[in-house]
Amino acid sequence: MKAAALTFVYNESVNLPLWIKYYGANFGEKNLFVIDRESTDGSTSNLGDVNRIVIPRDAFDDRKKADFMSSMQNALVNYYDAVVCGDCDELVVPNIGPYASLADYVARADFDYVTCIGLNVLHIINQETALDVNKPILAQRRYARFMSATCKTMLSRVPIRWMPGLHCLDRRPKIDRNLFMFHTKTMDYGIASARQKINRDTAWSEDSLSQNFGAHHRYDYAKFVRENFLDPANVINQGNVQPFDFSEEIAKFEAGIVEKEGFFWIPMDMNRWVEIPDALRTAF
């Protein structure tokens, strides 16, 4: 079994090492591909066996990013049995029990491409301390927010073309209930706040701004904190935690997929607040 992982970065001093550690353990570091927009923080300077592809840091264009990553993924599936394609704060994790690891899933699961159940890792700031990135992440975080917008088709054996944001694609999404994507963007208040400053300082292309691509990356600080930390803390503190069962959401997700001009658009407005099962909290 030969599998690869592909990501796209700029100054990801926290998330990129976690991405390399996780996917490197599953696929081998020589099978990881990092597209680097000329990072300046040293995070891409000494990547060892990881393949670094440097591109010019022009004004960030979400459409160009999607096209570049699609083209790279299309090429890599000619040489690998499967390819993971996504941002470096997105870790694809199988249900621990049926599968021992992501490598085990790729080796044994029957799929041509697969859509993950998307879970945003939460930092409940009045219950949980600051994250120690040198220790297992999920052992330090209990809660997650299911979001239909993060149910991404990230793992594939066949070529895929994505729209900006990598949410929508040219194949009908197919969720596997045994495959999750943990989005670590909000796993820690301090880390996320520093990352949001980098995002807000980024120059965006006219096309991305006119289409409102990546709007959440440009949130002001107050809105960013409210939506990602204060609101989740209020929900969890009030005891509004639901069972770790997404049957209802998956049914609505699949029914809500719309095809437009050869691309499949997913519902973006479904949420569920859950406690991460102990077995999954050993994943990374």
Where are these regions (language model features)?
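Active-site-proximal specificity loops/subdomain of glycosyltransferases
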Residues: G42-C85, V93-P94
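Short, acidic, metal-binding catalytic loop of nucleotide-sugar glycosyltransferases
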Residues: K21-K30
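Active-site acidic Asp-centered loop
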Residues: R37, G86-C88, N95
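Catalytic-site signature of metal-activated, phosphate-bearing donor transferases
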Residues: K65-D67, P94-F284
